[in-house]
A protein has these predicted regions:
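Conserved glycine-rich beta-strand-loop-beta hairpin in the small C-terminal domain of fold type I
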Residues: 2, 223-233, 245-258, 268
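Hydrophobic residues in well-ordered beta-strands that form the structural core
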Residues: 50, 71, 129-131, 205, ...
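Conserved core segment of the aminotransferase class I/II
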Residues: 153-223, 323
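Residue-level recognition of strand-loop junctions within catalytic nucleotide-signaling folds
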Residues: 179-180, 210, 258-260, 300-302
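Short, conserved charged micro-motifs
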Residues: 263-268, 305-309
Length: 338
């Protein structure tokens, strides 16, 4: 609805995003956003660059469109710009898909330098950036939680913002802010997917933003998430820091951990599930499984008490896992650059 788009454009301006209601399309959650952008822009054998590791829901969509996926490794302050430039010299992507704030699964945030650099490169090499933003409303430990889109003066960023993590997961609603020249294609794809996001959901969201103190609400959620995040980070460092490598998260609801070389996260998943803890094996977040020793823990729906319990169970059982699952030699193929 027009009213909701008006409210949302005000909200985005508050995040320093230069937009208006005509650039905003309302979508049924971020997954649909990725889907319609791909339908509108990606043809068979087009190249899409992604972070490694990345969100597997996006990988699946790119693959279903027949895209060729090229991965760029993540460093502690965002993706590896050196490797990105090497690949850009040789191959032209249609899109690069990124989560610049509190990346899923690593929790890493891009430095301001990298945010600006990525936009610079998109102009220089003429590709679009698909930004997936699910939780930049909060700052956690990050010095710059501004969306990449807020640095985008040249209309290179297609910006997807979902509200599931900050309102409620069952309410599949989000927005995609689309550069003018791409609007027709992407709007057509949205129309052919579901015509429009249910009116009732749009109206509820509009009333909520207009008549409730939306920013106050965000502040209260921020407190809850930040408390959980900081507690988990401290617990992981204290209890597991000397045994496992923990990715340098700056915030969010995910932590990405690394077992010693030669151990499998799939095996660890089975082992620790029997003890009552559920983790996500890292295999979900890679396009090519070179090495299955990473796993993710997600704290979105857990109470603080359960988080403490879960981490203690991992701490108490890790040595047992390591001795009983020694799994032969470590075969690691070298990365091949295209």
């Amino acid at each position: 609805s027009n009213q909701l788009r008006e409210e949302l454009s005000t909200y985005l301006k508050g995040k320093k995003i230069n937009t208006n209601k005509d650039n905003i399309q309302i979508i049924s959650g971020a997954q649909q956003g990725i889907d319609i952008v791909c339908k509108g822009l990606i043809n068979y054998s087009d190249v899409v660059f992604v972070e490694e590791p990345t969100y597997n829901g996006a990988l699946e969509v790119f693959k279903s469109r027949g895209a060729k996926i090229i991965t760029i490794p993540m460093l502690d302050d965002g993706l590896d710009i050196g490797i990105l430039k090497l690949k850009l010299e040789k191959i032209k992507p249609k899109l690069i898909y990124v989560m610049p704030n509190f990346q899923n699964p690593t929790g890493i945030s891009y430095s301001t330098y990298k945010k600006k650099k990525l936009i610079e490169l998109s102009e220089e090499y003429d590709f679009y950036i698909l930004e997936d933003d699910f939780i930049s409303d909060f700052s956690f430990d990050s010095e710059d939680n501004r969306p990449l889109k807020s640095y985008d003066m040249k209309n290179r960023v297609i910006y997807i913002k979902s509200f599931s993590k900050i309102l409620m997961p069952g309410l599949r609603i989000g927005i995609v802010d689309i550069p003018k020249e791409l609007q027709k294609k992407i709007l057509w794809a949205k129309y052919s997917s579901d015509i429009s996001t249910p009116g009732l959901i749009q109206k509820s969201m509009y009333y909520y933003m207009k008549y409730f103190d939306w920013l106050e609400y965000l502040k209260s959620i921020d407190k809850v998430y930040t408390k959980k995040y900081k507690l988990t980070k401290t617990l992981l460092e204290e209890k597991l820091g000397d045994k496992l490598k923990i990715s340098k998260s700056q915030g969010g609801l995910n932590f990405f951990l690394e077992l010693p070389r030669g151990y499998s996260s799939q095996a660890f998943y089975n082992f620790i599930l029997e003890k009552g803890v559920s983790i996500t094996p890292g295999t979900y977040f890679f396009d090519n499984i070179m090495d299955d020793r990473f796993f993710r823990i997600n704290i979105a729906n857990e109470t603080i008490e359960n988080i403490e319990k879960g981490i203690t169970i991992i701490e108490n059982n890790l040595d047992k896992f390591i001795t009983s699952y020694k799994n032969g030699e470590d075969i690691r193929s070298n990365k091949i650059f295209y």
